[in-house]
Amino acid sequence: MRANAGRAPVFKPGELNVYSAPRDVGEVSRALRHTGRRVMLVPTMGALHEGHLALVRAAKRTPGAVVVVSIFVNPLQFGAGEDLDAYPRTLDQDLAKLRAEGVEIAFTPTAASMYPNGLRTTVQPGPMAAELEGGSRPTHFAGVLTVVLKLLQIVAPDRAFFGEKDYQQLVLIRQMVADLNVNVQVIGVPIVREHDGLAMSSRNRYLDPAQREAAIALSAALTAGAHAATAGVQAALDAARGVLEAVPGIVVDYVELRDGELGPVSPSGSGRLLVAVRFGTTRLLDNVAIEIESIAGTDGQPVGPDGRVQSPWRN
């Protein structure tokens, strides 16, 4: 059901209730919490795919959960020349998918209702926002964090769910929640992939058949980098970049290896390998957690913790 403007919002359990006014979804969320329900937020920009539905399913696994899925193409996070107007808007199909998943609340605001006073107040995301994605999209994360903070304030969820595909976004949201004392638990959900390994993304639909075939190089590069990490940080980076640069039509924006908080990576231990590439105007991201298990010995061969020479490739 859709809420009617000018009336108190109505919530029907077991149905998909659609609210466009921030005040309405906020009132319903507060009322449900008072009855003992636990409010779960899944922020999206629509064009829902299996990656989004994995977030929904993770949220629904919480005992007593009522899931709120927001669908809002946020203009603040699109820079000059980016694809705001072209971004897919498939609201009817999205709502049908949410009904099939048993979601009870969809929040579908307009830009006017989210930013009634324009851009008077925004979030400054800090220095990490200038790195990685921020290198080519300098205003992106200010827009992301502003809308996420507004959604958290409007819905006031117990937990909010974000995919690990946009890993830098996830880290910055966690920083914001900690630094601004926002009372919510941020849950990261693993990447969902197509049958051939390509990370699911709403932007995949922009790829032509040749680009779509070439795009599997992203996951192949991450796999190569993860295996090569037994020979150290530089070996992992070289292996990943080598896979990407061998594929015609790919423009590599970055290949980076960081720690789990996106700080400098240690010579051994856990890390996060991140890649970003472009096919024409379509930009794709991917990442994977890796273990850097050894360092190079004096002869250039990887040496494990026991001091023995190891092969840089393992199954």
From Swiss-Prot:
Q: Which domain of life is it from?
A: Bacteria
Listed Pfam families: Pantoate_ligase
Q: Which residues bind (R)-pantoate?
A: Q77, Q169
Show the active-site residues: H52
InterPro entries for the chain: Pantoate_ligase, Pantoate_ligase_C, Rossmann-like_a/b/a_fold
Q: E.C. number, please?
A: 6.3.2.1
A single GO molecular function term of this UniProt record? ATP binding
* Bridged cysteine pairs (disulfide): none
The entry's beta-alanine-binding residues are Q77
Does the UniProt entry include the keyword Lipoprotein?
no
Keyword set for this entry? ATP-binding, Cytoplasm, Ligase, Nucleotide-binding, Pantothenate biosynthesis
Give the UniProt subcellular location, in the record's own words: Cytoplasm
User: Main role?
Assistant: Catalyzes the condensation of pantoate with beta-alanine in an ATP-dependent reaction via a pantoyl-adenylate intermediate.
- Its protein name is Pantothenate synthetase
> Origin organism of this chain?
Mycobacterium ulcerans (strain Agy99)
Q: Which gene encodes it?
A: panC
